[in-house]
Amino acid sequence: FLQGNPMGDYIAYERGMKEGDVHPVIAAMNTLGYACSTLGNHEFNYGLSFMDKVLAGANFPFVCANVARGQLAAQPRADDLWLPPYVIVDAQVTDGAGETHALKLGLIGFTPPQIMSWDKRHLEGNVETRDIVEAARAWVPRIREEGADLVIALAHTGIGSDAYAPMMENAAIPLAAVEGIDAIVTGHSHLDFPGPKYEGVAGLDVGKGTIAGKPGVMAGFWGSHMGLIDLMIEREGGQWRVVSAQTEARPIYERVERNNVPLVESVAAVEEAARADHEATLAYVRRAVGETSAPLHSYFALVADDPSVQIVSNAQTWYIGQMLAGSEHADLPILSAAAPFKAGG
């Protein structure tokens, strides 16, 4: 939620986070009334100090059971974790007769252990990551011991193989199979589950919306879907258990003739929460940074060399050359990769 668009970069690199500032995405999440959240790999892109300043503005807890300060301990439950591994929140449910019951929900979070490679410059020497499934097997029994009626995994990990392997990046299926987890909210791979792209994948039932037999959902990316897990539960022998479930990834728009057509109305309060920073971001990206001697276009960006992509690559090459000047690496060849981020104008 911190990285991936101009606003994220503007806040991190230009405006910054002063004491008391609330990040616009956190402001929106506060407005929506989030009960809990976890960290994705991109939350680490701007460094730990920036991330901590952002999280301080949240009116809800963040949890993550597999990122530890310094070095890992001998056992997961001895790790000095960067964030609390889990939280137990009080909820109210109404039965078929209209009676209300108190329910304790255990919410535990996980992020891909590969962040140590992806953000090495920020994380090396400061934190270490533990295998997602290993952490879950250690902490889920503890959550049950503390009285959680149901345990839901908030897992920024994709849906990969059903066969467990240590330090899996996409560990949703082995994670869901951990005893004591009742449901899983997964992500990372920017797809939607249940959905046709996962038909026939071992460990999944797209029709039932289950991952390793547990209700699960993956809600696309960039707010493209709302993930819904609707549980039917019953109390038996003093304990709550899931008897059936329905999961759905509800899209917020549909594609009609190459256009996005909204399926829901915008919430004015959420728009207002981010309005000032949205407008500041627009003003920032609309500033002139230079002038070209020839017009640039991106009409053929997806099929051939393109001036709009080439100028980005040239700028990157120049910048790295400046950074390496006078160093032991100054004579090394520089390779620059640039992507066609837009086409047609």
Labelled PLM ranges:
Residues 1-251, 308-315:
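Acidic, metal/ion-coordinating pockets
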Residues 144, 250-345:
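Non-catalytic terminal accessory segments
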